[in-house]
Amino acid sequence: VMTMSYVDEVLAELIEKNPAEPEFHQAAKEVLESLRPVVEQNEEKFRKDALLERLVNPERQIKFRVPWVDDKGQVQVNTGYRVQFNSAIGPYKGGLRFHPSVNLGIIKFLGFEQIFKNSLTGLPIGGGKGGSDFDPKGKSDREVMAFCQSFMTELCKYIGADTDVPAGDIGVGGREIGYMFGQYKRIRNLYEGVLTGKGLTYGGSLARTEATGYGLLYYTQEMLKCNGHDLAGKTVVVSGAGNVAIYATQKAQQLGAKVVTVSDSTGWIYDPEGIDVELLKEVKEVKRARLTEYAAARKSAEYHEGRGVWSVKCDVALPCATQNELHLDDAKALVANGVIAVAEGANMPTTLEATEYLQENGVLFAPGKASNAGGVATSALEMSQNSERLSWTFDEVDAKLQGIMVNIFHACDDASKKYGFEKNYVVGANIAGFEKVAEAMTAQGIV
């Protein structure tokens, strides 16, 4: 009788035990598939220690009700979640997402991915994620505060600077972090770095806003350099017009490249003179307007409705908008136009088919869990500053970020070579992230 491989066994059991959680199934499958070469070399030991079963089962899952009173005096009830997935290499770390789509499966998918991303940073942080199905859109400041205070009143029992340090994610920005920090401090009577993404007046870090976009470019620059290319003088296409896209564009231009596009949910800009970052920030961060305003204010810019940035000829493509935004057709257009590298700024922006097509055609492809890890890396640097009760200058944080991103690239590169998948940075990232966690778990026994 053909026995199933250990990876297949674990996946089959995971799907059976966690029904109706497709996002979690997809994430576990993607990671475990790429870990096959490592698992095969250690199959007997891993199986005996149930290492993969322990890896895919969170250490702790917390689900709670969140009652709060709206502006009309009506009591509303939401559901809160915190999945503490793995603490082998440090306290749990991962964002809080407030969005109507949030359910346990989505939080598990994000928490599982976070284990490997956090491991790759080289910093001592474990994996976790949390959130609620609360929708901050259309709510008043008072309602958001009431919700955040109720949410933290329960969550505060499970977190702490040396236990679990949440951060922001979709629907959770500086305002929400502030309200939650205030409530934690009031209930626990502790002023500690229990959350990251804090304001600069109460323990936040300089360069955190820029971190994901800047980090993406430091990673891309190193990937190009190690493959005989130079970022300077290259034409770059960026999608998105949010935090990641803006600071990726700024850093690309500082490093001598020319960024010719940005996009938002309604359309995109082609600017052959190069995107004017200050104008883009004015339109998006100050006015919170559409890109039509950018085009109206700049002669060299053309505005196009709908999607289409990937049709523009470029050397480097940086998807920085949202998940599954770069499809197979887009990948074909990029390859036909001679693209050298694609690096993910958003989480999972490239579909599986598009990723495979790019890799088959010799394009250097950087997976988000490596190339956009600058955000969580800088969160860990914020934790360091809180522990030391001091704050570093912008340049100090930026220099540390650059070093971390270069190290992440080499960790992915080395792991891809070690297992015979040279230049496959997707496999490299998963293996490099896994090896550290697996070694730490093994050293700490069956816990």
Describe each model-derived feature in a short phrase:
Residues 109, 163-167, 190-195, 238, ...:
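General beta-strand structural signal in soluble alpha/beta enzymes
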Residues 99, 118-232:
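Glycine/serine-rich phosphate-binding loop and adjoining beta1-alpha1 elements at the start
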Residues 267-365, 370:
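Rossmann-like adenosine-cofactor binding region
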Residues 45-74:
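Structured beta-strand/loop patches that form or line metal/cofactor-binding pockets in enzymes
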Residues 196-199, 204-313:
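Glycine-rich phosphate/diphosphate-binding loop of Rossmann-like nucleotide-binding domains
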Residues 22-25, 41-48, 122, 159-168, ...:
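Flexible, glycine/charged-enriched surface loops at secondary-structure junctions
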Residues 3-27, 223-224, 335-447:
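Adenosine-phosphate binding glycine-rich loop
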